[in-house]
From Swiss-Prot:
GO biological process terms, semicolon-separated: methylglyoxal biosynthetic process
Family membership: Belongs to the methylglyoxal synthase family.
Protein name: Methylglyoxal synthase
GO cellular component: cytosol
Length: 131
């Protein structure tokens, strides 16, 4: 499966910890990420990650384009709900695309853990047939 990892600045440490904790599962899948998030995950875990621009420079839109092309199966986006983001319209557009195309989306660690367990059990294998 193809999984996107995105984290706002104050959530990047959480994403790195999450990726490290679930490294055995992530190793079985293809990972994509916005710039700094992808770099930090790669450096901390050794996982292969295809990196796009940082979110404010268009990375959220690049990942959104993948969703619109049915080229992503899951998005894990650790958002910082307490800090205003300069690219909030891009963030909202990405979340909307996940809804439009029925892409599983987690926006915090608790929901991301649920998705990872579902992924590991094969509960998301239906995505293979939506291509």
């Amino acid at each position: 499966m193809k999984i996107a990892l995105i984290a706002h600045d104050k959530k990047k440490d959480d994403m790195v910890s999450f990726a490290y904790a679930y490294k055995p599962i992530f190793e079985q899948h293809e990972l994509f990420a916005t710039g700094t998030t992808g770099l930090r995950v790669m450096e901390a875990t050794g996982l292969a990650v295809t990196r796009y621009q940082s979110g404010p420079l268009g990375g959220d839109q690049e990942i959104g384009a993948m969703i619109a092309k049915n080229a992503l199966d899951m998005v894990i986006f650790f958002r910082d709900p307490l800090t205003a983001q300069p690219h909030e319209p891009d963030v909202n557009a990405l979340l909307r695309l996940c809804d439009v195309y029925a892409i599983p989306l987690a926006t915090n660690m608790a929901s991301a853990e649920m998705l990872m367990h579902a992924l590991n059990r094969g509960d998301l294998d239906y995505r293979k047939f939506r291509k």
